[in-house]
Amino acid sequence: MTFLIASNILLWIAFLGVTVVMLGLMRQVGLLHERSSPMGAMITDHGPDIGDMAPEFDLPDYFGRSVHIGGASERPTLLMFTAPTCPVCDKLFPIIKSIARAEKIGVVMISDGAPEEHARFLKNHELGQIRYVVSAEIGMAFQVGKIPYGVLVDGEGVIRAKGLTNTREHLESLLEADKTGFASLQQFMASRKKNAA
């Protein structure tokens, strides 16, 4: 009888151990899934299409300086839709600055939210040449559903690339899309397949 009780207790301990290990594995798979983002910026099918003229806006930035979005400009402009409370946007900010310098493009960060959140965000980040605009209207015109979201507009005001930009690779894929003429990595791969056939 004592043997049966001891074996039953050992089985329950083993069962609980396997359960703990399984929960740990599930957590690790979840973290791995979260970290392995898709290659290239994920394009949503909402808003103006690639190749369309970008909607035009003339409005003040956070500091009251005039900003023109869309239409002809001296250089390409990256419109980054962000939020002051978005942790991914916070991580991307130095990357956006470095890419803007390296690629010699203009950057307009477009955000929405409470004034105190913007003040806190701007207190912690040096903008440099980046313009910071608070406008829900622009986000609605581009039909941005998730952030951070990037739209690359060329010097003639045409949308060259757009997509969800969670990592440096996603941001760089927007610029590569403009350089190669392919709107997305998927379009590039499809053209290679077509040429090979």
Swiss-Prot record:
GO molecular function list: antioxidant activity; oxidoreductase activity
Pathway: One-carbon metabolism; methylamine degradation
Membrane topology category: Single-pass membrane protein
Keyword Transmembrane helix: yes
Cell location: Membrane
Keyword Transmembrane helix among record annotations: yes
Pfam families from the UniProt entry: AhpC-TSA
Domain of life, per lineage: Bacteria
Protein name, per record: Methylamine utilization protein MauD
Species annotation: Paracoccus versutus (Thiobacillus versutus)
